[in-house]
């Protein structure tokens, strides 16, 4: 797993603080939200930010018990 660039973390964190209701654990909806809330033109950067937000939103769920 790669370390995300600083600009991805900064923008992702800013978006989560400003618009927490606009994001959830679904990558596709987060991708659309990033597109509407920012002026990012690059598809790759948009997807990286959406992926970062998706991981941050999903990290609040407890791990499933496996055994």
UniProtKB/Swiss-Prot annotation:
In the record, biological process GO terms are: translation
Gene3D superfamilies found in the cross-reference section: Ribosomal protein S17e-like (1.10.60.20)
Q: Does the keyword Ribonucleoprotein apply?
A: yes
Instruction: Choose one Gene Ontology CC annotation of this protein and give it.
Output: ribonucleoprotein complex
Which keywords, in A-to-Z order, does the entry hold?
A: Ribonucleoprotein, Ribosomal protein
- The yes or no answer to whether the keyword Ligase is present is no
Do you know which Pfam families this protein is assigned to? Ribosomal_S17e
A molecular function (GO) held by this record is: structural constituent of ribosome
* Family indicated by similarity: Belongs to the eukaryotic ribosomal protein eS17 family.
Q: Tell me which PANTHER family the record gives.
A: 40S RIBOSOMAL PROTEIN S17
Return the NCBIfam families for the record: PRK01151.1
UniProt-recorded name of the protein: Small ribosomal subunit protein eS17
The root-end lineage is: Archaea, Methanobacteriati, Methanobacteriota, Stenosarchaea group, Halobacteria
């Amino acid at each position: 797993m790669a370390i995300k660039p600083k600009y991805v973390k900064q923008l992702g964190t800013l978006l989560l603080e400003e618009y927490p209701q606009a994001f959830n654990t679904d990558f596709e909806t987060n991708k659309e939200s990033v597109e509407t809330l920012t002026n990012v033109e690059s598809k790759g950067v948009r997807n990286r930010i959406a992926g970062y937000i998706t991981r941050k939103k999903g990290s609040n769920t407890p791990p499933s018990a496996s055994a």
